């Protein structure tokens, strides 16, 4: 996808034109959701976080704001919005949810639903010190360029898995986060 000039209207049109394929919803898996925040600009951005190095799981990794569904969450979307508010102070009412991508199975046993939402450019992010060490924005056109992701095939717990790897500035984007970004790129019609 040679979309260095990808604008928000093009992104929205493509996303809404090509609806994600229905996917299985595993009732026996723990559920989680992440917000995939698209920053509303003429050349939109993709908001990402770097997890605190002090966390027990996925410490220091680049991620979307999100986490496990809890009993206060009415829906997966509500869980993603709550977690985004807790982790980086994005007010739920500031997010225009435009859809969801197919759920992804995590290595920690969760089924994670990516919730795609548009956020205003003038938000003041406040990273939760317990969970987030950095908040940064990547140009959406660059994030959705499939050629920037490189595959790595790994064998874990008796199964073969493909994970995707990429760098942006000094951030290493890989695993589930890179996979979700690639899925979003494919959803809007990018070709490998």
Swiss-Prot record:
Pfam families: NUDIX. The gene is nudL. It comes from the Bacteria. Residues 29-160 form the Nudix hydrolase domain. Belongs to the Nudix hydrolase family. PCD1 subfamily. Mg(2+) binds at residues 83, 87. It is an enzyme of class 3 (hydrolase). A motif (Nudix box) lies at residues 67-89. This is Uncharacterized Nudix hydrolase NudL. InterPro entries: CoAse, NUDIX_hydrolase-like_dom_sf, NUDIX_hydrolase_dom, NUDIX_hydrolase_NudL_CS, Nudix_NudL. Its EC number is 3.6.1.-.
